[in-house]
Amino acid sequence: MPTITLPDGSQRSFDQAVSVADVALSIGAGLAKATVAGKVDGKLVDACDLIENDASLQIITPKDQEGLEIIRHSCAHLVGHAVKQLYPTAKMVIGPVIDDGFYYDIAYERPFTPDDMAAIEQRMQQLIEKDYDVIKKVTPRAEVIEVFTARHEDYKLRLVEDMPSEQAMGLYYHEEYVDMCRGPHVPNTRFLKSFKLTKLSGAYWRGDAKNEQLQRVYGTAWADKKQLAAYIQRIEEAEKRDHRKIGKRLGLFHTQEEAPGMVFWHPQGWTLYQVLEQYMRKVQRENGYLEIKTPQVVDRSLWEKSGHWANYADNMFTTESESRDYAIKPMNCPCHVQVFNQGLKSYRELPMRLAEFGACHRNEPSGALHGIMRVRGFTQDDAHIFCTEDQMQAESAAFIKLTLDVYADFGFKDIELKLSTRPEKRVGSDELWDRAESALASALDSAGLPYDLQPGEGAFYGPKIEFSLKDCLGRVWQCGTLQLDFNLPIRLSAEYVSEDNSRKNPVMLHRAILGSFERFIGILIEHYEGAFPAWLAPTQAVIMNITDKQADFALEVEKTLAESGFRAKSDLRNEKIGFKIREHTLLKVPYLLVIGDREVEMQTVAVRTREGADLGSMPVAQFAEFLAQAVSRRGRQDTE
């Protein structure tokens, strides 16, 4: 006779084992109809699952995040149902939940087209209208194999092979279609009405490019139509802001098939890149960092010592010369230790902060590449701080403050922080981990910012802090990291002479603020929709003449602004002034300076903004002062 304790503390007793759905019905018909699943003693279960003993129960509905994820997972199964009806020879692979949606990987003899995706979506809607129950059957392993063998689902059989210890598995039946899953899933298709398929792409079995290619169908699903409509609106806005489209339109960069994952920077884009690099160089110099430069190609032996060859070789570009193996560096850390190791250091020289705008290359799968956001060749604003254990907290606190200041300069004030602590498998004593975690937590507390604790999510060699930016669309981008490392200095024999004249290994703080220049520029493009603040804009002002008579004065203005350190250019083409204004407005130039006969006579410029505001006529010196103030505010004018 189980007694069920509900979240409000109330209890309900039953004469026999009772399902989650039955408990919901005992509370009310409305709740029963809204029940997606249950959480029994903290564990998610299906609505049909029986509770045989006393337990706590939370009814999960579409309003709960867990309920929304279950809806998305069940929508993936619905994709399978529709695909098998439309394309009977297709073989289903996996269909997990992802951020804001789901996907299903499918093996089929040809690539799916947009017409196929529309047909699949239409069939899914027809299946939902049938309002059928989703039936769960916990099935013995041998019978599961029989089911998928009879259906020629080769990939499902491979997945069963991957779980040799599982003697029974959950099979979920959508009418004639069956899928395998740990669950839980929705009890009925009525919960799946607010969905949309979003895109198609290729994928590889087990994510390995050496394996066969699959079709991936992406979709999104929400609790109701209103949420779905809001999401679609966000996606449409995001598509308008796609950095690939804006980058092409503004002439910033391009990518091409002959160099997958590599960026061709155009003059305007490289100017933007240089602004970022010069800004970060100044910031780091002012905060005690020493800039270095290390080799691109390094012998295999160093990567073996660091552990990268054993754990990361598949992601490294390698080459051979004179019977020696080399790798193009995927990260800068081992090389920075080599710089530290040149000459024995004293504790008086610590902390030592070594920074590099380090060009790295990683052999990312081609299917994962995305514009300049996910590339194979990139540059990090990388630095490593070598310090004593006693200096960990102060260095961490200083880095947190520096990082938040940098983000504010770029217009980002909504920052999410996560602290990841010790995993089960780790190096270093518990006492050292206690001190390291305490140092990071205290540094975060001193910044006065809330953070999410992620127990067990740290690296085996130390805890870490992650910094994520929220952009104008509410999207979260993980950029900065602060990673404590007790392991690499030992592996690569980094030492210093301590106060008692003994040799000790320093603690190594891996840190980056932007992450990679390429990805951060992509984020900036989408956040500002290409309309960068004046300090970042590749061209800050364009001087336009109305007729040829004003050309000489326009060139004088350009020269004056350039000598004052501004990025200005003249447009002296024989075009109507309205045409020129429109063109440079579309190119997102912050300030448009128009010169006619009156401006030449008065030695002024008529100033307009790209938003269309008329700032009136002013002397060139006054405009230069105005522009200097706009530049000095950096990205803070809209955030403070």
From Swiss-Prot:
The keyword Mitochondrion does not apply. GO terms for molecular function: ATP binding; metal ion binding; threonine-tRNA ligase activity; tRNA binding. Its cofactor is Zn(2+). GO terms for cellular component: cytosol. Its EC number is 6.1.1.3. Keywords: Aminoacyl-tRNA synthetase, ATP-binding, Cytoplasm, Ligase, Metal-binding, Nucleotide-binding, Protein biosynthesis, RNA-binding, tRNA-binding, Zinc. This is Threonine--tRNA ligase. It is an enzyme of class 6 (ligase). The lineage of its organism: Bacteria, Pseudomonadati, Pseudomonadota, Gammaproteobacteria, Pseudomonadales. Residues 1-61 form the TGS domain. InterPro entries: aa-tRNA-synt_IIb, aa-tRNA-synth_II, aa-tRNA-synth_II/BPL/LPL, Anticodon-bd, Anticodon-bd_dom_sf, Beta-grasp_dom_sf, TGS, TGS-like. One of its GO terms (biological process) is threonyl-tRNA aminoacylation. The gene is thrS. Belongs to the class-II aminoacyl-tRNA synthetase family.
